[in-house]
Amino acid sequence: MSERLEKLAARLTERFKAAGGKVDSAYGELTLTVPAAAMTDTAKALRDDLGFEMLIDLCGVDYQEYGVAEWSTEESSNQGFSRGVEKATFGRFIFDEVAERKAHEGPRFAVVYHLLSISANQRLRMKVFCEDEEFPVVSTVTDVWTSADWYEREAFDLFGIMFEGHPDLRRILTDYGFVGHPFRKDFPLVGHVEMRYDPEQARVVYQPVSIEPRVLVPKVIRQDHRYVHESAQEKSADA
């Protein structure tokens, strides 16, 4: 960690430790995790006292199946990865099928705020976990950073996270008749319904999805020297 980051981390720890704040460093970036109850005061302090004038991004996170992978390997070969992959993630199920929910540790939903200090030329990530998994809610920061308006609407639309005090919390990406929140891990990857144009009714209609979910494994074919079979290399050497 650079000297500038060390100084910022020390300031953040000193300022927010009493309120339950925790500072972590990874990949040259700092993350400040604060309790939901202290988020509003923390956001105002970051803007007014530490110079983070700008919110450049905000997103929701669903940790329901964090770390669960359907295919993983530490080895590869010129034969490619195995194509026989078992479905593992919670969202990969057929329409109307009840999937088994996997247990997870810690809070399920979090909101991540990416902050920029123009005056100090520094960036900071603030993370807040929702206390209630069934009804995830945090306070809005639109009164701290006005740019949070549409970001919070997007997180509400895709993850179902409520932002208490938001002036106009409604869907922004999906249509008004959409059911559910598509970025949640328990939302089926194939969706609930599909649309098609019905020429007899002369309008768009909804119907149950006809797509069968399957696990896709990338298959990469390269012809450079790193992936040529040993036998081919031997023939080339003999020529």
UniProtKB/Swiss-Prot annotation:
Residue runs in coiled coils: none
Enzyme kind, highest EC tier: translocase
Superkingdom of source: Bacteria
Any one Gene Ontology molecular-function term assigned to this protein's record: NADH:ubiquinone reductase (non-electrogenic) activity
Catalytic activity: a quinone + NADH + 5 H(+)(in) = a quinol + NAD(+) + 4 H(+)(out)
Keyword Nucleotide-binding: no
UniProt EC number: 7.1.1.-
Keyword Cell cycle: no
Any one GO cellular component localisation term in the record: plasma membrane
Subcellular location: Cell inner membrane
Similarity-based family: Belongs to the complex I 30 kDa subunit family.
Descriptive protein name: NADH-quinone oxidoreductase subunit C
Organism, scientific name: Thioalkalivibrio sulfidiphilus (strain HL-EbGR7)
Gene: nuoC
